[in-house]
Design a protein with these regions (language model features):
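Extended acidic low-complexity intrinsically disordered regions
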Residues: 1-7
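Short aromatic-centered micro-motifs
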Residues: 14
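Short, surface-exposed, charged amphipathic helix/loop patches that serve as local interaction elements
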Residues: 7-9, 17-106
């Protein structure tokens, strides 16, 4: 299925079944809603992964549906890659590029 992409998508690319999808940073509203579950991420929480992917992809592909993501686009093998891609795009993963809080840098 083909979805229209916004003119200037932002985020991180991830190739799924031969197609490049651009996973955008989560909006504040989506992050706020999902934060309690994001703090204790369990890879077997497939509903959370579908919600995260939907919140991300909806920003770059306005016509995409959660059902398409959960039922057709993603499979169990994509769980970690999708989660890491979205969290990285959203700035919710420490990358080692900047000192962590409390790190004196000495």
């Amino acid at each position: 299925m083909q979805f229209n992409q916004v003119e200037n998508p932002r985020g991180n690319p991830l190739k799924i079944d031969g197609q490049i999808w651009i996973f955008a940073p989560l909006s504040l509203g989506v992050a706020e809603k999902l934060m309690p579950k994001l703090k204790t991420f369990d890879p077997s929480d497939f509903a959370l992964v579908a919600d995260v992917a939907y919140g991300s992809l909806k920003r770059n592909y306005p016509d995409i549906t959660r059902d398409f993501i959960a039922d057709e686009l993603l499979d169990v093998g994509h769980v970690n890659d999708v989660f890491e891609t979205v969290m990285g795009a959203s700035g919710l993963v420490y990358t080692g590029d900047e000192p962590q809080e409390g790190d004196s840098g000495e």
